[in-house]
Amino acid sequence: MELISDVIFGNGMSVPGAEDTSVLCDEQGFPYYKGSTFKGVLREETERYLEWIGDSEAKNKIEKMFGMGGNDNKTEQIYFSDFKLSPYVKEKMITEITRMENETADIAEIIKECLTNLRTFTSISKDGVAKKGSLRIARCVNKGVSFYSDIVCEQEQEQLIKDVIKTIKWIGTKRNRGFGRVKFSIEEVSE
């Protein structure tokens, strides 16, 4: 998944006095996107796609692939790992930052700062003036970053999944504000 625009993978947390919306980062400071969140996006897009093509078995296919909503019985036949940077990129960043910084530097914070940026938002009144108390700050993952995930599914579902993934163009928070434009590429790996 390549980020075509800045993206907000919200983590549901805020940093008082700094960020109203933060991004998901691992313990090393690298941003990532939850596979389970993407699975929800794919489920929604699959429902739309099957409805659009007029598939009479849409409901059964959805439940077989993704399980039944609200049901904890793990009957689904599709699995997604989290979307992460490549191990090569992560290793090179850690090596380079460690080489350049002193031993007291917060490497995780430096990594996060390299891969993300802060954006400010405000509401504008009818008079064209910023509304009082409306300033918000969000941390965004920089456009151009690529993430990788593994998808495990039944062979009979591969083509449908490929077709639907090609239709996904936006993910994350604030998509209606121009954030979250993505491009997916699929590489098959045989076992």
Q: What residue ranges belong to the model's regions?
A:
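RNA-binding basic/glycine-rich loop and surface signature characteristic of RAMP-family CRISPR effectors
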Residues: 1-115, 130-191
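Internal, well-folded beta-alpha domain core
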Residues: 119-120, 124-125, 141-143
